[in-house]
Amino acid sequence: MTNQLKSMVLALGAVACVAAGMLAQAKINPTDPQPTCEMCPGTYIPLSELDAYTKKAMAERIVDQQVRDVFIGKAHIGIGMVYRGRLDQPAPDSVAEHDLVSEVYHVISGAATLVLGPDIVNRQRRPSTLRTVIEYNGPGNNGSDVRNGVAHQLKAGDVVVIPAGTGHWFTKIDDHINYLMVRIDPDKVTPLKSEAQSKAYLAKPAGD
């Protein structure tokens, strides 16, 4: 190797070291805002998978199903699919409230009346053994009514935000309502659910 080539190699090595050092310094600079989920991958859920959950719900009469539960640093984010059939009048004590998990609904199809409000009548703790409590939305309460609740007429395309602690109550469903649910879990009370776990769940026959 000639002296000129050696000099070029050394120079390139020095530049690479300086560049790497600058990148590392930029990444760990304590004065900059830092990602709350550093180096976390994104999550993609295809429509075909969401549709498979809806088909399973209709075939097996399942209301609520968790598609994913994802770690995003300071919280878990759950993605659920919900299918509710016709409802002429609400069932007794069917007001729901979750202490720690907030929910966002995006209505896919159907129409329903949903009552929202924080003042729950005849509040009763939900059993801690319920699958929905353990896997989907954490501890909370049921109730018989929502005092001064506000009724919303939901239809396809609508979005509803339900903070933790707010009562929500379907009082009428015209034929059905199908909605995608985003569950925001800052206390990480719900277990994570991966794509592989989702596929295994969908592959199970009815009753398993």
Can you describe what each PLM-predicted range is?
Residues 99-114, 118, 129-141:
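Short, conserved beta-strand element in jelly-roll/cupin
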